[in-house]
């Protein structure tokens, strides 16, 4: 009797699994995860209508804004941004791409356009990640496009939604932080993707990709120092591998974008402004910065970055990577080397802020580190999974069943865990944080108070403006504010932007 019942239960379970297999095809899984990701972005983009500039947005964009207000053309504004870039290269920093982009916050064209900041940054982050992973998984590893897309969606969900609260405003909503770090990070991903694409393309397609990669390489080299250093390390390792394997004859054209990047790299490093800025900061010596980076990477990975949703979603990627490895002729022979390189690459990203500033506390820096950690962790897990598949070769039928159970278990646990997490911690995910501030009204109140301030700034009847402090400061939108001191640099920046004499917050009576 027991054997009969066990047999029936086994048959019923097998039928259920086969039904799930037919339902959960790679194409449908990719579509489902895409819908989930797009839905998760909606609150982040909706709350953007209450987003307003602060701090460096005013100081960096004031001159371009004044030219535009005086009836200047777009070309004159761009020319002013270029002049500012040259001036900063001599007097403040060598990151020419960041200097140029920083001079063009959306509010220089109109205060009501600042909502575009998260749209622009999230589009760049999403598009560049999709493109890079497609080139790695589909072009290099011969994966099917649907499995590759599913992995990309999981990576983006982790990257955007699991970023901890302190980094979100600077990574997505504050233009001066988002454009210099998240956007430039996206440029580097596009650069990597174009290098891979050019390596596999032929004829005119290769020429076009090499030219595009050369432009992006130069722009990436002029971005923030964290991205610049990481890209240089990746390219040097690539040069070493291609030289060792004698691949230059068939990929000689790659020297153009690589060379263009290093021309920009040298241009950014030798800038006189770097030495001026270094004199105003107290950073660590190079050896200490490297050692602290190696420790800091491990410390952050354990204490900050590796949340339970990240672990669950990475586990969900394992059967997808296994499926890719089954059909790939890639050998995955060096898992230890790849993991160590990944650890070194993420650690290296900590070194520039430690060397230049002596700390890495800024939210935008923390966000960049998290983005890189998620990408490197994903690729390392994929490589180790591929190595295990090639080494042990379990039968494909068991693989498929185990993969289905793994995916279902991960998604069920993620859904249940998220429900019981966001109730006591509504700001746990980026999307739920946005929904919380939208539903409780704090975002709307903040937006209304910002609009009231803007009206006062544009009122030419008084050049000495006093404004009330904000009654609400939504966690996703509020970065910093002016003070009661008219000589504070943030106050001066706002006053200069709107051509006022002074701007202050009213002192408490």
Each model region followed by its residue ranges:
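Membrane-interfacial entry segments at the cytosolic side of transmembrane helices
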Residues: 205-209, 245-259, 330-337, 393-412
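Transmembrane alpha-helical segments
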Residues: 125-137, 187-199, 232-241, 314-321, ...
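Membrane-interface micro-motifs in multi-pass membrane enzymes
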Residues: 56, 147-196, 224, 348-382
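Short hydrophobic alpha-helices at membrane interfaces in multi-pass membrane enzymes
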Residues: 197-219
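Hydrophobic membrane-spanning alpha-helices of multi-pass integral membrane proteins
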Residues: 260-262, 337-350, 372-379, 408-417
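Intrinsically disordered, polar/acidic, low-complexity terminal segments
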Residues: 18-92, 106-150, 392-509
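Transmembrane catalytic cores of multi-pass membrane glycosyltransferases
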Residues: 43-120, 175, 221-365
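Short, Lys/Arg-rich, polar N-terminal cytosolic tail immediately upstream
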Residues: 1-23
């Amino acid at each position: 009797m027991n054997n009969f019942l066990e047999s029936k239960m086994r048959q019923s379970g097998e039928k259920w699994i086969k039904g799930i297999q037919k339902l959960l095809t790679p194409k449908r899984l990719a579509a489902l995860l895409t819908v989930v990701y797009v839905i998760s972005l909606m609150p982040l983009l909706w709350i953007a209508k209450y987003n307003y500039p602060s701090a460096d947005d005013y100081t960096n964009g004031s001159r371009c804004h004044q030219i535009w207000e005086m009836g200047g053309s777009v070309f004159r504004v761009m020319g002013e941004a270029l002049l500012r870039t040259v001036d900063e290269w001599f007097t403040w920093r060598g990151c020419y791409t960041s200097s140029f982009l920083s001079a063009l916050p959306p509010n220089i064209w109109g205060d009501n356009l600042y909502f575009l900041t998260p749209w622009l940054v999230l589009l760049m982050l999403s598009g560049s990640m999709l493109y890079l992973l497609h080139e790695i998984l589909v072009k290099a590893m011969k994966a099917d496009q649907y499995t590759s897309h599913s992995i990309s969606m999981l990576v983006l969900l982790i990257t955007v939604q699991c970023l901890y609260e302190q980094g979100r405003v600077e990574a997505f909503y504050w233009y001066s932080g988002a454009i210099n770090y998240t956007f430039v990070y996206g440029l580097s991903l596009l650069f990597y993707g174009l290098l891979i694409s050019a390596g596999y393309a032929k004829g005119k397609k290769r020429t076009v990709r090499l030219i595009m990669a050369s432009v992006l390489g130069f722009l990436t080299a002029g971005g923030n120092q964290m991205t610049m250093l990481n890209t240089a390390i990746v390219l040097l390792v690539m040069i070493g591998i291609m030289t060792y394997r004698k691949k230059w004859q068939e990929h000689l054209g790659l020297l153009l974008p690589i060379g263009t990047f290093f021309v920009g790299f040298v241009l950014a490093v030798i800038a006189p402004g770097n030495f001026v800025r270094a004199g105003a900061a107290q950073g660590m010596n190079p050896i200490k910065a490297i050692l602290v980076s190696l420790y800091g990477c491990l410390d952050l990975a354990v204490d900050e970055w590796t949340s339970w949703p990240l672990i669950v979603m990475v586990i969900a990627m394992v059967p997808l990577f296994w499926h890719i490895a089954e059909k790939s002729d890639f050998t995955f022979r060096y898992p230890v080397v790849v993991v160590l390189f990944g650890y070194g690459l993420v650690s290296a990203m900590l070194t520039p802020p430690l060397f230049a500033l002596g700390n890495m506390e800024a939210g935008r820096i923390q966000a960049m580190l998290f983005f890189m950690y998620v990408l490197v962790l994903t690729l390392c897990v994929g490589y180790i999974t591929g190595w295990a598949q090639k080494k042990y070769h379990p039968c494909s039928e068991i693989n498929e069943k185990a993969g289905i159970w793994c995916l279902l278990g991960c998604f069920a646990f993620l859904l249940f865990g998220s429900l019981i997490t966001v109730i006591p911690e509504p700001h746990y995910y980026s999307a739920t944080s946005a929904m919380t501030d939208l539903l409780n009204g704090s975002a709307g109140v903040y937006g209304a108070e910002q609009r009231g301030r803007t009206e006062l700034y544009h009122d030419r009847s008084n050049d000495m403006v006093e404004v009330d402090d904000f009654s609400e400061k939504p966690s996703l939108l509020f970065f910093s504010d002016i003070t009661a001191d008219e000589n504070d640099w943030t106050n001066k920046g706002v006053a200069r932007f709107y051509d006022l004499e002074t701007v202050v917050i009213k002192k408490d009576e």
